[in-house]
């Protein structure tokens, strides 16, 4: 199963950049600054529609984007085609699996913005991704990524399948009005995996209505669990932040979990 569910929900690339919580995220400046500090080149895993990739290229940094969804990549290419030629030349995108890829070059920085790492729902998958990252980093290169900080109180709630209406509606350029709701189908507390659905209620300009469903899985990863994964893969954690203004971890709860990790040495591969 593709835990992100993007290729099973072909409408997502068209909707993605208009979803209010996505469009209003405060992470773009954080990742662009990290890219500029590295000097590039940068590899972004899970680049999606280019929400972070294009601003990074605008800032003068060479960046390569990798994504498993051809639909998301085509949306990214369309966004790039609207940019000046110098921006287009600094950005390259290609389809690939973040668990197993070989690009034949090294990068100063690898980023994984907005939680695609959590679509890796087993430890072997997580370690495979970190191993691939390690192979593509220059000596002393850095990995920067964010995940959500699991809320113990939320995890304790049963997955009742009820839809919640927590988000502002949005309108697509063609006039379709969209309301998105969320529901949890299953919480596997042993595997730390949530299975949920994002349900889109679409009203067309002619009044016709449509219900579209995006099913996905995400693994909850706690702070020290992530730090052990990184250490096992040959990284040392330099910073852990609670938000994209670099507030220290623990200053808010649940907040974000944002890691800056440095490659320290090649390590022996272990099984999962």
Model-derived segments and spans:
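Conserved class I S-adenosyl-L-methionine
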Residues: 1-48
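Conserved SAM/SAH-binding loop-helix junction
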Residues: 51
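C-terminal lobe and adjacent flexible extensions of AdoMet/dcAdoMet transferase-like proteins
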Residues: 217-272
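SAM-dependent methyltransferase
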Residues: 145-227
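A short glycine-rich, Lys/Arg-flanked "PGG" loop and its adjoining helix->strand segment in the class I
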Residues: 127-139
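A short acidic, Gly/Pro-enriched loop at the edge of an enzyme's catalytic core
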Residues: 102-109
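Class I SAM-dependent methyltransferase SAM/SAH-binding core
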Residues: 54-100
């Amino acid at each position: 199963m593709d835990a992100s569910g993007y290729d099973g929900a072909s409408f997502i690339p068209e909707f993605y950049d208009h979803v209010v919580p996505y469009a209003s995220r405060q992470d773009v400046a954080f990742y662009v600054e990290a890219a500029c500090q590295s000097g590039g080149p940068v590899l972004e895993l899970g680049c999606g529609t280019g929400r972070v990739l294009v601003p990074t290229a605008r800032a003068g940094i060479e960046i390569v984007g990798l994504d498993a969804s051809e639909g998301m990549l085509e949306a990214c290419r369309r966004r790039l085609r609207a940019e000046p030629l110098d921006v287009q030349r600094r950005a390259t995108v290609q389809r690939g699996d973040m668990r197993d890829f070989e690009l034949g070059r090294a990068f100063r920085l690898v980023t994984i913005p907005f939680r695609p790492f959590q679509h890796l729902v087993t430890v072997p998958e997580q370690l495979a991704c970190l191993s691939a990252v390690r192979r593509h980093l220059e000596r002393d290169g850095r990995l920067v990524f964010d995940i959500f900080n699991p809320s113990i109180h939320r995890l304790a709630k049963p997955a009742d399948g009820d839809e919640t209406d927590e988000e502002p509606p949005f309108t697509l350029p063609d006039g379709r009005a969209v309301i998105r709701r969320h529901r949890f189908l299953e919480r596997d507390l042993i595997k730390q995996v949530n299975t949920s659905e994002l349900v889109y209620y679409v009203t067309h300009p002619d009044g016709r209505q449509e219900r579209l469903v995006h099913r996905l899985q995400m693994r909850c990863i706690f702070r020290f669990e992530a730090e052990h994964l990184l250490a096992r893969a040959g990284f040392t954690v330099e910073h852990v932040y609670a938000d994209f203004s670099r507030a220290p971890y623990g200053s808010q709860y649940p907040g974000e979990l944002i890691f800056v990790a440095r490659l320290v040495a090649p390590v022996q591969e272990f099984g999962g």
